Amino acid sequence: FELLNEVVEQENAEAWNLLIAETVDAIRRIARDTIIIYGGIQWNSVKTLKLLEKPKDENILFTFHFYEPLLFTHQKAHWVPTISQTEDIYYPEAMDYYRTKSLPIGYQGEVVCKAQSQTMGTEFITEMVMEAVTAAKNAGVTLYCGEFGVIDQAPVEDTLRWFTDVD
């Protein structure tokens, strides 16, 4: 079972943890050994796995979705109105460029703006994924990347470089 895909609002973190506990208890009454999957708030962000309470159940997997940097992976996406619908975004590119361009997209761009990485590329990707790995280790659970990718509007060569870095 995956409990719910992409809980969004940050203020729902506590309520999400309560719902997880109640739902896991209910599932365990009818399916003791079935693996249960859930992720953090803000679209299953790597940054929010650390907000999940440590599970009391051993058949739990944490999931995360990886679309960072969102500015690149979601460029020209009609469902993200704060991202330019006309400008090509390249990968990799200077970190300052990404930070400046990520500011207008609000908390969906915060991941880039708050990153410690000095370069946009493998250093940034590693920093992001290691946050998920650390959260899962601290919780004693297996980690699963449930979604990742790049929109078909991105330059093809840059998309291939992104996939190489994520690999």
For the regions a language model picked out, list residue spans one by one:
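C-terminal/domain-terminus segments
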Residues: 141-167
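Alpha-helical scaffold elements lining the catalytic groove of polysaccharide deacetylases
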Residues: 123-125
